[in-house]
Amino acid sequence: TAAIFNAEGSTVRMPVRGQEDLIEVDSGSLPGSLQATSPEKVAPAEFDLVVLAMQEPQYSAAGVRELIGRVAASGVPTMAITNMPLLPYLARIPGLETASLRPCFLEPELWDAFDPDLMTLCSPDPQAFRPPDEKPNVLQVRLPTNFKAAAFANEVHTAMLRNLDAGIEAARFESPEHGALELPVKLRVYDSVFVPLAKWAMLMAGNYRCVRAEEMRPIKDAVHGDLEASRAVYDWVVGVCIELGGDALDFVPFEKYANAASALASPSSAARALAG
């Protein structure tokens, strides 16, 4: 996989407002460079920011778990894009007893070496998938929403995220066919540690309810098949987050979520994984 990325770069396809067809962004046509390598060859201390973009159980894989140890030892600010908020991030929520949550993780010891002040969370709201008949360097965005990241504990580290936020906001993609385009997926930075937890309600009301005893169902059907049941699940999860200390404004209104879910005509990745 690394060889393909290094030889061909990456290709991301996404819908853009005002365009009938998907817009294809090829990394080879952009400034900067993209490099891929195997876990044992990565030196985290050489980077300004580490992004953990897999799901929590995958970090226990041989080679990857050793890399995670080096990331923690490096002291480099780390942003997780995971459905499951990692233990160091949960430790940043005032009053939350994280010791009782350790059984929820495949290998909780993996995260013990991280400084909570160096960990933040980014809600993985954009829906994307790898087309099954394409190479692994191709990604297709199904629902282009924004990434929502919480600030780091240290404003120096947060400034790096805010610079990324501003740079992405100002950037325009020069399409050979359509000229300068504003791409829809942004990075937004918030002061509240609860903003990335908005994903919890979406997962419980939609993604995980795609799982059925005999078959999967699309997220759209999971949410809209019984809209009031979905609303009840969604509002209950948001209520838990508010009881933990969040503000109602930290979370996405159910109506906005339900409207977005109506475009999700495939089962969630969690349902597909369980279905084998």
Regions found by a protein language model. Name each.
Residues 9-10, 64-67, 93-96:
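Short, glycine/charged-enriched secondary-structure capping and boundary segments
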Residues 39-86:
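Rossmann-fold NAD(P) dinucleotide-binding segment
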